[in-house]
Amino acid sequence: MVVETDKKELICSFCSKKQHEVKKLIAGPAVFICDECIDLCTDIMKEESKVALKQITSSIPTPQKICGILNDYVVGQDQAKKILAVAVYNHYKRLEYVQSGNNDVELNKSNILLIGPTGSGKTLLAQTLAKILDVPFTMADATSLTEAGYVGEDVENILLRLLIAAEFNIAKAQKGIIYIDEVDKIARKSENPSITRDVSGEGVQQALLKIMEGTVASVPPQGGRKHPQQDFVQLDTSNILFICGGAFMGIDSIITSRTNHSSIGFAANVNIDKEKNNSEILKSLEIEDLTKFGLIPEFIGRLPIVTTLDELDNEALITILTKPKNAIVKQYQKQFELDDAELVIDDSALEAIAEKALAKKTGARGLRSILEHLLLDSMYKVAELKKQRVIITQEVVNGLVEPIMTSLISTKSNKKQPIIEDIPA
């Protein structure tokens, strides 16, 4: 039996134009699309990208305003804030320039490297910048990344997180910010190139090069490793701002060794930087120090803006506890307030908390865990008792006595007492 088939002329599934009416007809699974519809889709996507960029660039604050907003959340680090504010402002102005079609001068992208001790505010600076600019933001830990083909996380998964942050709006994601933390942990194991594979060090640096410089990356929308059968989202990284951060423990010795090397005589090397702290030493940082530390020259070249952050002292930690809009003490006070209770932390207690964080060398990052440990029992009790005032003193912080709890109902006026005592300027 012969089955007769109608040989119908192929048509575009979108505009219904016949094959002979268009230049090209591309076949997909049970559908066809013509070159004209492809051009139209491309134009729509370009227009969406322009709109997304216009929304960002039209609301970019000036460097001084960016710095002012950073001051509300980040304590100290004035030079780093100034450098970041100018860098971010110039980055998004560059996008506006590129989108305008001007090509008389080519403006290159300037990614940023932040170097500073643990808890000095690197991550907070990057997060706050993204909040100020209202752009998609994601963070990645460099230690979890490995070179493609090895156990670990591919660098494309960082781009997937940015897409998720942008709710899969590709145009928006392409103008976002990616913060890669602990980038010092992917330094190669020795200064000289190794014949063995360094998949979590130099291999990761090599993998990051392309996306940091600018490429159209194939991102698996479901995450995980790539395989030929899966679909990919194409993401252009040319306009994504990369901020890398790390503590770079030991780089101060490299800098000191270099600066002392030029001195003459045996006595010259005897701790001429003895009185300098790490922050002062880091200000003498040069590219060769980063290379000696283990970053490859090509990777350093993708991070033209390098800024160092100061180690936080006792005074700065007390300010972090009490002054910013998101101050940790203010957060705990609000938590107590939700249970009809008050939290009072006196000056001596604040001093003791700061000293504990300094002793642990955790910087601002350790303040929350210290307070959480101090207030755990009090938070456990006030939820039941209600109307309680909890007082934290130096003795409480040092573990000599329990937090002092008094009833708010016993006071006649029942007025709230000052929650933080004035801290001397």
Curated annotation (Swiss-Prot):
GO terms for cellular component: HslUV protease complex. PROSITE patterns: CLPX_ZB. InterPro entries: AAA+_ATPase, ATP-dep_Clp_protease_ClpX, ATPase_AAA_core, Clp_ATPase_C, Clp_protease_ATP-bd_su_ClpX, ClpX_bact, P-loop_NTPase, Znf_CppX_C4. GO terms for biological process: cell division; proteolysis involved in protein catabolic process. Keywords: ATP-binding, Chaperone, Metal-binding, Nucleotide-binding, Zinc. ATP binds at P117, T118, G119, S120, G121, K122, T123, L124. Zn(2+) binds at C12, C15, C34, C37. Disulfide bonds: none annotated. Residues 1-53 form the ClpX-type ZB domain. GO terms for molecular function: ATP binding; ATP hydrolysis activity; ATP-dependent protein folding chaperone; protein dimerization activity; unfolded protein binding; zinc ion binding. Belongs to the ClpX chaperone family. ATP-dependent specificity component of the Clp protease. It directs the protease to specific substrates. Can perform chaperone functions in the absence of ClpP. Component of the ClpX-ClpP complex. Forms a hexameric ring that, in the presence of ATP, binds to fourteen ClpP subunits assembled into a disk-like structure with a central cavity, resembling the structure of eukaryotic proteasomes. PANTHER family: ATP-DEPENDENT CLP PROTEASE ATP-BINDING SUBUNIT CLPX-LIKE, MITOCHONDRIAL, ATP-DEPENDENT CLP PROTEASE ATP-BINDING SUBUNIT CLPX-LIKE, MITOCHONDRIAL-RELATED. This is ATP-dependent Clp protease ATP-binding subunit ClpX. The lineage of its organism: Bacteria, Pseudomonadati, Pseudomonadota, Alphaproteobacteria, Rickettsiales.
